[in-house]
Amino acid sequence: MALTRLLIKDFRNIESADLALAAGFNFLVGPNGSGKTSVLEAVYTLGHGRAFRSLQAGRVIRHECAEFVLHGRVDANEREASVGLSKSRQGDTKVRIDGTDGHKVAELAQMLPMQLITPEGFTLLNGGPKFRRAFLDWGCFHNEPGFFTAWSNLKRLLKQRNAALRQVSRYTQIRAWDQEIIPLAERISEWRAAYSDAIAADISATCALFLPEFALSFFFQRGWDKESDYGELLARQFERDRALTYTAVGPHKADFRIRADGTPVEDLLSRGQLKLLMCALRLAQGEFLTRQSGRRCLYLLDDFASELDTGRRRLLAERLKATQAQVFVSAVSAEQVADMVGEKGKMFRVEHGKIEVQPQD
């Protein structure tokens, strides 16, 4: 799975760009504010329908332009496909696949599985549970065909239930929602638990390579007491939920906790160690997908050198090379990525939103 070509129009500070990409490493080098992260963000947006630095379309559309347009050619298991995404300032989104309109962003996400490693990505480890749920849900989305529909339906039903909690006085008035919510909640929790169990060995092995000085452990918490029946719990906690005006337990409260030597990682590890752990988690997840489905992720690394010394950069570079996946890396200077440059790599110089191929020695 790789992008062979990327066209960018009116995205962030990039007016227009047409990039022929390497199947291996693609390096984006330039000073801070040059637009190199914008290229990474364009790749991410093409596969997710939204940017990773802003959820508001207006903030990623170039100044005084009506919309941004992204287009890519995808080499997917010896089959080439065309994908396109545009979004207006009003938030209107258009997805095109192989020349036809009317497609969903979820289809792009299936075609372009990506792992994102950014300075903001520490939220996976020290942020709220929603970031770790997203980690599990990425895996479930790519491994369980019914997950996306089930999770979308559950979120819709929970939103309706929460709205109803503000208006009802008896549990019988809300039972109809619970009868639909309960089977979805249990199925989603089972998928998440199965995925966390299945990927545990991959995570442990990769973490042992990156952080051998720690004994790491992982725990999936489904969002309600494991000894309790979810349906009975919803009925029992109705008065509490009504007072809170939201549903306090369920898959939307699940978490995936990580400990080092018995201590939460965010309380023990340094910034550099947390970045290595984040890289290990993303790599393990991508490699697990490849082994299960034969599909390779795209890896996006922003500000690669920050928090990592030379030895750790080299370790990460070697592991990324071993995946044989397509990798996009941003850095301030070519020297920072010297250990990663190889015969399958391509260097791009980015300045003021202009992108040029830079010859390699």
Curated annotation (Swiss-Prot):
Swiss-Prot/TrEMBL GO biological process terms: DNA replication; DNA synthesis involved in DNA repair; double-strand break repair; SOS response
Protein name as annotated: DNA replication and repair protein RecF
Coiled coil residues, start to end: none
Source superkingdom: Bacteria
Keywords, in A-Z order: ATP-binding, Cytoplasm, DNA damage, DNA repair, DNA replication, DNA-binding, Nucleotide-binding, SOS response
Primary location recorded for the protein, binned into one broad class: cytoplasm
GO MF annotation list: ATP binding; single-stranded DNA binding
Subcellular location: Cytoplasm
Family: Belongs to the RecF family.
GO CC terms in record: cytoplasm
SUPFAM superfamilies reported in the protein's UniProt record: P-loop containing nucleoside triphosphate hydrolases
Residue positions binding ATP: G30, P31, N32, G33, S34, G35, K36, T37
Function: The RecF protein is involved in DNA metabolism; it is required for DNA replication and normal SOS inducibility. RecF binds preferentially to single-stranded, linear DNA. It also seems to bind ATP.
